[in-house]
Amino acid sequence: EMAELVDVYNHSVTHQHLIDKTDEVLLNEIISAQLRLKSELSQDNKFFAYPYGEFDGKTYHLIEKYGYIGFGQHSGAIGSMSDFLNLPRFAMASSYAEMDSFVTKINTLPMPVKNEEPKFMIISGNNKPALRINFSRSLTSNERYQFTCFVSGQEMPDLTWLNSESVIVQAKESLPQGRSRYNCTMPSKEKG
């Protein structure tokens, strides 16, 4: 009876890193998992959660070509301007599974982000990468003041406002090899 309350979506066959893989490997990981979901669970919803939240241009465009909605591993709310090939998802496991944080998560509003640059966050060479965030509207001076970012394991990054609609976020220290995260927040007066 609980099965009616649960959907299981595609997360690949082997949950391996999908960066720099051949088309053959990528298609096998995505399509074989989808066929198994359809065969064993009679579910054929085309949602794909990138393993480890990682993808490159090739993986992104294959997800697009085959009509999937993609999920990264970054936290955030989904809005009308969200990239439906790289949607955010909130973690609800282990230390992130507290009910108080769940209430906060389901009441979170999307930030008015139009896009981010670079689109594909595979970094090589520049160990203090700059992230440009372009907003879908002008932010008030108070919103810009309250806009805050964090970098995994570091002090707060440098924020350089280009204008009221664009900001550059840059780590103060080199990022370690492996996965790192830039996380930005901004309070809202709206109710979530």
Describe every region a protein language model picked out.
Residues 42, 64, 79, 125-127, ...:
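A structural signal for short secondary-structure junctions
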Residues 54-56, 64, 186:
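Generic alpha-helical secondary structure signal
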Residues 1-58, 81-91:
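Metal-dependent polysaccharide deacetylase catalytic core of the NodB/CE4 family, i.e.
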Residues 48, 66-69, 180:
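Intrinsically disordered, low-complexity segments enriched in small/polar residues
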Residues 1-7, 13, 62-122:
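Active-site-adjacent pocket scaffolds in enzyme catalytic domains
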Residues 1, 11-12, 21, 29, ...:
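Generic ordered-secondary-structure signal
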Residues 37-51, 78-80, 155-173:
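Repeat-unit-sized solenoid/scaffold elements
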Residues 93-192:
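Terminal accessory/targeting
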